[in-house]
Amino acid sequence: MTPTQTNTATMQQRWETVMMNNYGTPPIVLASGNGAVVTDVDSNTYLDLLGGIAVNVLGHRHPAVIEAVTHQITTLGHTSNLYATEPSITLAEELVALLGADTQTRVFFCNSGTEANELAFKLSRLTGRTKLVAAQAAFHGRTMGSLALTGQPAKQAAFEPLPGHVTHVPYGQVDALAAAVDNDTAAVFLEPIMGESGVIVPPEGYLAAARDITTRHGALLVIDEVQTGIGRTGAFFAHQHDSITPDVVTLAKGLGGGLPIGAFLATGPAAELLTLGLHGSTFGGNPVCTAAALAVLRVLATQGLVRRAEVLGDSMRIGIESLSHPLIDQVRGRGLLLGIVLTAPRAKDIEKAARDAGFLVNATAPEVIRLAPPLIITESQIDSFITALPGILDASIAELGKKA
């Protein structure tokens, strides 16, 4: 049954009057959230299985984040990059420790994932080389440098020519990567799991091979952990499953628990490339956002949410696949970043059917439904989705019949 949308319709009309049309008109208008549940302006409730696209790792209205933000905003809200604050220093120290590199590591804070990747692009130029390698169908952001790295021509076409000397190779194919990297390559950019393109997991050993290839040619290995980091896959950084140390790691999304923050970590010689005056951010390292991030890290550690993400993700995958529904081919991903791969390109219809049933999911590809719920989601909430899923899939089939 389609939820009531009386107030939603009014909000949608207001949206269409004043907002840019790059997103289209949102199907619902959310008003509040608590834990893994959100409520719209017509009082319909939804289990949030997308978490703001892997942002709300502690769910909505988490008391630790509220306390940290409230304390900081009533103490000191903003300083610019001209002055230091204790929360940003502490957060940098904690991220360095979590990365665990055995060489010097330095941190730069910004406001988003695309900004972190933009800096990685700029840093690569400081090597004296200009060639870059990234993956076909990858997503690294929408600002110009990050867009050049994004291996999706449909997103790039309107903005060409793009910066860069970027070569895109098939994701997961070691031979193709090895053939593209040479002694003129500045950096290789890779996601540990390709989230936007359908939660695609590379073959075992791929990231380790990428580390070997880049080391052999003196190129930087940049690992984009914007979607996979902050414990989502069952390790704090997804690349840690492969026991490698990148030269650069980019972060955002879940780091701030809902507040905008990005981070750039560089190790070894790469940590010394950025020198006085070469980059900056007015809002980067904002004390309120860094305080929120520290609260996120504390809760992840004290409540064991990183390990829990792996356990719950395995359980969720098994539960969905055991339904043996004709529309489900497989479930791929790791931890609580999962993609339900469909046997037909019905993802948009299923996203709508799920929303009508009270579940927020994302059609990240025509044949893939992405799940990235808060790491605090309960087993019973996961079970409620698995129980409802056959009906959701059947409803999407019925809707297709109406369109025919």
Swiss-Prot record:
Binds 1 pyridoxal phosphate per subunit. It catalyses: N(2)-acetyl-L-ornithine + 2-oxoglutarate = N-acetyl-L-glutamate 5-semialdehyde + L-glutamate. It is an enzyme of class 2 (transferase). GO terms for molecular function: identical protein binding; N2-acetyl-L-ornithine:2-oxoglutarate 5-aminotransferase activity; pyridoxal phosphate binding. Disulfide bonds: none annotated. N(2)-acetyl-L-ornithine binds at R142, S281. Its EC number is 2.6.1.11. The modification N6-(pyridoxal phosphate)lysine is found at K253. GO terms for biological process: L-arginine biosynthetic process. May also have succinyldiaminopimelate aminotransferase activity, thus carrying out the corresponding step in lysine biosynthesis. This is Acetylornithine aminotransferase. The gene is argD.
